[in-house]
Amino acid sequence: GCPWMPWC
């Protein structure tokens, strides 16, 4: 996941 988007 991305640091700012947990669903990435």
Curated annotation (Swiss-Prot):
It comes from the Eukaryota. The modification Cysteine amide is found at C8. Expressed by the venom duct. The modification 4-hydroxyproline is found at P3. Disulfide bonds join C2-C8. The keyword Ligase does not apply. Keywords: Amidation, Disulfide bond, Hydroxylation, Ion channel impairing toxin, Neurotoxin, Secreted, Toxin. Exists in two forms, due to cis-trans isomerization at 2-Cys-hydroxyPro-3. The cis conformation is the major form. The cysteine framework is C-C. Belongs to the O2 superfamily. Contryphan family. This is Contryphan-Fib. It comes from Conus figulinus (Fig cone).
